[in-house]
């Protein structure tokens, strides 16, 4: 089925490519996996690392909508994204209920840093809840296929058996790799044979599961994806077990709470604007921007090609490096601590603090 009708021509913005849907696989009642066909001349552009995501773009009723969806296929395969329907969600309802093979969708190249190194002899711990399995599945399949001595421990939480995404794919991975994949399913609204596997993946449950069934100290890296509360609980539990925080990585799809408000000094004293230079695709543009707006929102009025998706500090699409001046980042659920220390920010959450600021999207 074709995309919703638009009342304005779709602008040709650099970074997006029209890809055909190769397959739509029903995973459960409210979720699908959408595979994209990639033309030969774009295969290098859409080569991805496990754990990355694609940003999809749709124009409807004169407005532009963007959503990011994690890739679930292993490295080297066609890009496939997992999508769960969100009530009232324009994009997810369209993808889950209407999209069919042959449809064309605007897609930006893979992005994201929630990606492991495919090194031999490593043990990766994965904790996912609900649709958070999507990038985790790509990571698990890729690291297991990369070397015969890699291992994966995966804790996967869901409400009920019929809400589990990628049931067959996980079973196939277990059959293919046997003891190298330690797979633990936990259900919150359906009793399991062993009580330890019944309940939500909160701090109490995670502490119980990890303490009883996993050699936490043997795991080299941990990868967390799911609701904010689950990932925060997992970080707390893992660091409580002595895991180095730098070895714990997390990915979020959305955050319900609004970002904190910034309390600015009197603009008559401190200045109401900054000279901001943005660098993207080798081109620099300097503009006078209000300090009351994020760098992304203000700069987009001049540079419409700036990358973005969620604008909520979650996906990381708008990541850039501050090479001059200072900004205040309201919140960050996408960048690792090391990235922030190196000067990277989410421009959708960052407001200028100094008279001059330079942000480099190419870094």
Give the predicted meaning of each segment.
Residues 1-13, 18-20, 30, 40, ...:
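Iron-sulfur (Fe-S) cluster-binding modules
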Residues 4-104, 108, 158-161, 171, ...:
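Ferredoxin-reductase
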Residues 75-78, 118-122, 147, 352-361:
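Ligand-binding loop in jelly-roll beta-barrel domains
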Residues 93-268, 272-277, 284:
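FNR/FR-type flavoprotein reductase catalytic core
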Residues 226, 234, 252, 278-280, ...:
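Active-site proximal loops enriched in glycine and acidic residues that flank catalytic Cys/His/Asp
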Residues 271-311:
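C-terminal accessory/binding modules appended to enzymatic or scaffolding proteins
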Residues 285, 298-307, 316-363:
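Iron-sulfur (Fe-S) cluster-binding segments and ferredoxin-like electron-carrier domains
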